[in-house]
Amino acid sequence: ETENRSSRKVIFPETTVFEKEEVRAKLHRRFVGAMGEELSHPELVDSLCPVWGKLYRRSLIQKSGARFVDLAEIGSYEDGFFNLEVFGKADRVVYLAAYLYHYRRDGSSSVTSGYNPRLYDQWQTLYDRMEAIIRSNQLGSEYEAALNNRIALGILGLGLNITVSTQSMGKKVKDIHRIIRQERYRKAYKNLPLHYFPIHWKLFYGCARHGFAFGVYALLTVIQRIISR
């Protein structure tokens, strides 16, 4: 629930038990990034991540060695990174299609609601740490592609962060242009499968792919207005 609206968080349509291989195939990889049809809703790709919607066995936490990473290092997504480490050691996960927790988010106090001038650099650290996990655990090409998609989708969060800054419009567009022309992002957009996206997201990420920073900025201002209603 936010200040202006309330909605149910539905991940799977029914109670589901995931055994070891299904945990890897259907859950663990999603903490790295979206694939296939999951890309059709970029705004929902991290719905699985919050720790407030989960109960963990202490033994699993101890087995995984997972710890929350300081937001000063990775900017955001501390829940998702924690789950990436935990679910990598999970042999069985049960999803309950029931509402057991009412979570209220006060936008004015959220760590993601204000401008963060370090967010770009912090997210590069997050991506580097994810790459290290993929390499050290030999998770393979699917995980690499999922991370590639996360990087590409990330211009939404980075761009919204820029739009709420007090900088001039020209400086905001310049900052967006600098990001989408970075080699890491150019590679990500080159491999992003846009055919999964609905038309409005296809337009947004198409602008990013082609380096059209003003188009990205214009669409971000529309998105920001919708969010702020």
Region spans (language model):
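Residue-level detector of family-conserved "landmark" positions at structurally sensitive sites
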Residues: 71-75, 144, 190
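Amphipathic alpha-helical repeat scaffolds of TPR domains
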Residues: 148-160
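All-alpha amphipathic helical-bundle segments outside canonical DNA-binding/catalytic cores
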Residues: 140-149
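Donor-binding/catalytic cores of nucleotide-activated saccharide
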Residues: 1-94, 103-105, 109-117
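Alpha-helix N-cap/helix-start motif at coil-to-helix transitions, marked by capping-box chemistry
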Residues: 50, 55, 121-124, 149
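Membrane-interface aromatic/basic loop that binds lipid-linked glycans or pyrophosphate carriers
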Residues: 10-11, 132, 163-229
